[in-house]
Structure formats: C-alpha cells, structure tokens
Amino acid sequence: MTFFVLIILVVGLTMTTASDVLILGSTSMGYANQQESKVHCRYSKAYSMLQVKCSDPKLEEIPRDLNSNIQVLDASFSRIRDLRNDSFSSYTKLLYIYLGDNFIQNIEESAFAQQYYLEVLDLTKNGCDNLPKNLFQLPYLRRVYLAVNKFGDSVFQTEVTSPLNFLQLHRNKLTKLPEMGYLPTLQNLNVSENMISRITTKELARFCYLEVLDASKNPLNLEEDNCECVIMRRWLKLRKIIFKPEYNCTPAAFERCGNVTFSNETLTIYDECTNILRIQMQTKKARNIWIIVVCCVACFIVIVFLVLLCFHRRNKRKKQKLKKEQQRIAANNANTQLLNSNLK
C-alpha cells in the first residue's frame, strides 16, 4: 500500500513541475529549470526563437526575472499600464513584442531605446496617446500595430529611418495621413475608422511604394469641382495602389478634368522619395559588396596561413626525420667502431 502511495506522490509532483513551464518540441531544450516570475510565464520555441508568453490578468508590468535571451515577448491580454525606460532593459535581443489588449497609457521616451533588433511591435487596443520619438529610428523595425488607441496627428510628426513596411492605425484620432516624412519602404497603411476628411496626391507621394491604403469608415470628401477626385483616381491607378473604400468619380468630373495633370510639387516629392530608396538600396548593395570583399580577403589570408602552416609542418617533419636519420647513422657508426675495437 505504501508503495502505491509513493508512486502517486511522484507522478503528482512530476505533473505539477511540468505544468509550470510549457516547452514545445524536444525536452532537451533546457528551459525546464528556468526561474518563473510570479505570474506564470510559459517558454517555448517559435521558429527556432526563444519565446515567452506572460498573458495574465494579474500582470501589471513587464516581468523582470525572465530569461535575458528571449526573442519573442507576448504579454497580451494583461493589465500593464506603463512602459518605463527600464521595462525592457534586461531583454536586448527582442525581435517581437506583443502588448495588445492592455491598459498602457504612458510610454516613457527611452522605453524601446535598447531594442536594437526589434522588428515587430504590437500595441493594439490600449489607451495610448503618445509614442517615443525614437521608436521609428530603430534600424530593423518593419511592422507596427497601433490600432484602437488615442493617437492624434501630432504623435506622427516625426522623421522615420526604420525600414517600416506595415503601419496599422485603425480607430485612432487622426484627421489626416501621418506626416512622417518620406516612407519609401511602406507598403501597407491602415487608417480606417479615424476622422480623416481629405487625402491628397501630395500626401500619397511621400509613400512612393505604397501598395494598400485602407481609409474606410472615414468622412472622406474628395471635391469634384476642383478635380481632386479625378486626380486621386489617376494617381491610385498609376501607382497601382489598392484603395479602400473604392472611390468613384462622376462621369461629368472625368469629362471636365480630362486634361488635369499632377502638380509639380507632387511629382517632386515622389521623385525625392524614390531617390531615397534608390540611395538606400545602393548603400546596402555597396555594403554587401564590401562584406563580400572583406570575407574573400579573410578567406585568402586564412588559406595562405594554412598553406604556410602545412609547409612549416612538412619542413619540421623533414628536419625531424633527417635528425633521426643522422642519429641512426651516428649510432650505427658508433656500434661499428665498438665492434671493430672489440675484434682487435
């Protein structure tokens, strides 16, 4: 009877320990002994990246005792209210941060300053009305989800150097498209359910490689009297931009504005935007060429070193062999002399 009780206790203890840390795949990943924060955070592997999920209604701040090597942090559906300058200071390898559906209302200026490798940030459905100005200077940031917040136009009056290709601003407090300078890498922009009443080709020219613009459920009013509607339709068609909602002009407007062209200012802005991307691509190409050249030179040096090392070792072996041969000959001569002396 005692034996069966011991078995039940061991099995129960094992199940309790296993439930604390969720590990996907092989049990040899080595995270089972990871110290857990007060809120149960689950570790797993996602496409070879170390991921931690801390979604919990009791979580009110970013945990401080997580594995410092995490690359994916998911604290969605929690109760986080502030992101301080040191909230992520222990986790400098993050690529993905998911903080959707929290109560975040304040983000300090340096909250993301150390996230050099950050690629994706999700702040959907919070109470945010401010963003750090340096967020859009992160060198690898490409996708940002900011839907269902309180962001106004002033938040996005900042220059962008990040390679941003996706920006989600659904249901905020925008009255116009974001004024973020030139965004040559942006492909998808969602500003639906805001308070935008007007979109011009001059604004769109700053997004010179835009593919999708969702402006649905905005009080848009493209005036037909001054040919705004026709000019917009032509720009969207020329640049192959998918525009939501589909906006049609009247036949009378097309007839009246048949000879209207884009303004010189719009075309200049578009050319400057494409030039920026061209320079970026050329810089990247030149950098890659230099990397290849440096790698080739390094490989050549290594090969020369290995060849010289082989010659050195071969010469060393020859010298050792010659020395042994000389020692053998000397020993034979000594033995011969000794034998001759004994015969005399």
What are the residue ranges of the model-derived segments?
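Conserved LRR concave beta-strand detector
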Residues: 51, 72-74, 82, 96-98, ...
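Leucine-rich repeat domain C-terminal region
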Residues: 140-143, 147-284
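C-terminal capping segment of individual leucine-rich repeats
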Residues: 66-68, 89-90, 113-114, 136-138, ...
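Cleavable N-terminal signal peptides of Sec/SRP-targeted secreted and luminal proteins
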Residues: 1-20
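Membrane-proximal C-terminal cap and juxtamembrane stalk of leucine-rich repeat ectodomains
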Residues: 18-34, 217-344
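Canonical position 11/12 of the leucine-rich repeat
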Residues: 57-60, 79-81, 103-105, 127-129, ...
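Canonical leucine-rich repeat
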Residues: 62, 83-86, 91, 107-110, ...
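LRR N-terminal entry segment and analogous cap-like coil->beta motifs
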Residues: 46-103
